[in-house]
Amino acid sequence: MTELTHINQNGEANMVDVSGKQDTVREARAEAFIGMNAETLQMIMSGNHHKGDVFATARIAGIQAAKRTWELIPLCHPLLLSKVEVNLTALPESNQVRIESLCKLTGKTGVEMEALTAASVAALTIYDMCKAVQKDMVISQVRLLEKCGGKSGHFVAA
């Protein structure tokens, strides 16, 4: 089993030293879903929400969140992301919105946390914008879909 890299020999939280690593291209994709009533989803899809374009706002929030992951998660490194993409898809057959994020850089550490943060914050933003009409929306299935680059190699979720 692989060791926990953020815990030092004394069992204390520790930021990993990546200074000796080579720069490589790293990429990660993540997803999240938010479920809601059909009426709430229809309001989003029709553009009739009084707060404006829900998807555009969630997309920008996800991008901003990816860039600030290091400020939210204590042991994440500040990263110079070269690409952040957040795509939102309405799924009327299941009354959900699927959010998929992509983060990319050339650097010494991976971008999994940035991709997960982007998808999560985009979902939270949808919740925030729609909570006035529905409070029981459910954010679910936040997960890493794929990562490549770095010493741990290529990962694809089952």
Curated annotation (Swiss-Prot):
Binding residue positions for substrate: 75-77, 113-114
Pathway where this protein functions: Cofactor biosynthesis; molybdopterin biosynthesis
Single GO MF descriptor: cyclic pyranopterin monophosphate synthase activity
Signal sequence range: none
Record: active site: 128
Name of the top EC class for this enzyme: lyase
GO biological process: Mo-molybdopterin cofactor biosynthetic process
Catalytic activities: (8S)-3',8-cyclo-7,8-dihydroguanosine 5'-triphosphate = cyclic pyranopterin phosphate + diphosphate
Classification via InterPro entries: MoaC, MoaC_bact/euk, MoaC_sf, MoCo_biosynth_MoaA/MoaC, Mopterin_CF_biosynth-C_dom
Keywords noted in UniProt: Lyase, Molybdenum cofactor biosynthesis
Gene3D superfamilies membership: Molybdopterin cofactor biosynthesis C (MoaC) domain (3.30.70.640)
The enzyme's E.C. designation: 4.6.1.17
Family that this chain belongs to: Belongs to the MoaC family.
Subunit structure: Homohexamer; trimer of dimers.
Known function: Catalyzes the conversion of (8S)-3',8-cyclo-7,8-dihydroguanosine 5'-triphosphate to cyclic pyranopterin monophosphate (cPMP).
Protein name as catalogued: Cyclic pyranopterin monophosphate synthase
Organism of origin: Actinobacillus succinogenes (strain ATCC 55618 / DSM 22257 / CCUG 43843 / 130Z)
Lineage, top ranks: Bacteria, Pseudomonadati, Pseudomonadota, Gammaproteobacteria, Pasteurellales
